[in-house]
Amino acid sequence: PDSDRILSLYANHPEGGQWKQFTGQLQVIPEVEDYTSSDILSCGAFSARGISAMLMGGDERFLPFFGLKLVKGKGFSPSAPNDAVLVNEAFVKKMAIQEPVNYRLVCNGEHLIVGVVEDFVIDNLSRQIQPLLIEYNSTSYNTLVKIKEGSMSVAIQKIKELWKKISGDEEGLKFRTMAGMYEDLHQEEQRVLQMVVLFSWISLFLTALGLFG
């Protein structure tokens, strides 16, 4: 519901501790409501025991940022082990795990489940619930910023000024609204679907030519 007022911020390999300094000062901006380090808009894939799930990263601010509730266990913290992960209810059900907290997943290394999150819709357009695994990642250069209602243009200007003050390079900061990125993703999905349908018809046509040729 907040995707139209959530900005995704990204910079290509900022120098030294510039990004950490930048994100640490975001809440000084009055128009900024909250922020979190997350790559929720560029999800990967996780596979174990022949079962696939979406994979993303998040930090200790991830759950409160999206207003998510823990069903079991605990959320991330700065003292969380490097292999700590959160999973959603759909993941637990799909994997048929009886006691998910402190359960160890083995796939490209080990992952320790520290908590279970309620199912939530990642993509507001498709509204689909999928098995999800969230890795602890507090150092991502992808940051989501929630802007107060009616303050988007002012907030963007102040964010750009803050980045320029810290890095000296205003152009190096990239940002999109979460809603806009969802729309781009779905347009790409529609293009792929149209191509699949087109090639299916071509295949049927060529098959028919072979039968009657």
Identify the function of each model-found stretch.
Residues 9-14, 50-51, 75-82, 131-137, ...:
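Short, contiguous acidic/charged loop-to-helix segments that flank catalytic cores in large enzymes
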Residues 17-34, 89-93, 108-193:
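"Rare, low-scoring activations can occur
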Residues 37-40, 73, 175-178:
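Conserved beta-strand termini and adjacent loop/short-helix elements that scaffold enzyme active sites
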Residues 42, 97-102, 138-139:
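A short, compositionally biased
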Residues 1-57:
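Membrane-proximal extracellular/periplasmic loop immediately following the first transmembrane helix
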Residues 190-213:
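Hydrophobic alpha-helical transmembrane segments of multi-pass inner-membrane transport and secretion
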Residues 1-9, 69, 127-128, 138:
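Membrane-proximal juxtamembrane linkers immediately C-terminal to transmembrane helices
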Residues 52-130:
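Hydrophobic secondary-structure segments that place a key small or acidic residue at a functional site
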